[in-house]
């Protein structure tokens, strides 16, 4: 099983969201969930939309943690996991870059992301 990460905008007047982009690495394994939550200090929930101004802060924290303290987070990676600290770094960087690319045309506080 894997997550599906998407970037969305909220449709005015109806409270619904429309996917506008997805990162290059948009389907990381569920096995990496504990590692992501730990390094980003973010207990994200599936099915919930998060404003990207907040998400970018958490992604930046996670990227720094994985770059400078990889061994601390490696222990959260399951033994039989397909992921690694390096691939986790690629995933978080991919999500951040996708958000920032959308923010070139849409204000960051108007963009949302979802881990599904």
Question: Where would I find each of the regions flagged by the language model?
Answer:
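Acidic (Asp/Glu-rich) sequence patches and key acidic residues
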Residues: 1-108, 112-116
């Amino acid at each position: 099983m894997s997550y599906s990460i998407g970037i969305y905008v909220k449709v005015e007047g109806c409270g619904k969201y429309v996917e506008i982009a997805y990162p290059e690495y948009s389907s990381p394994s569920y096995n990496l969930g504990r590692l992501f939550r730990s390094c980003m200090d973010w207990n994200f929930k599936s099915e919930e939309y998060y404003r990207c101004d907040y998400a970018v802060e958490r992604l930046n924290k996670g990227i720094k943690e994985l770059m400078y303290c990889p061994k601390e987070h490696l222990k959260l990676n399951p033994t039989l996991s397909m992921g690694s600290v390096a691939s986790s770094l690629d995933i978080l960087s991919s999500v951040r870059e996708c958000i920032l690319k959308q923010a070139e045309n849409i204000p960051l506080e108007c963009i949302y992301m979802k881990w599904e």
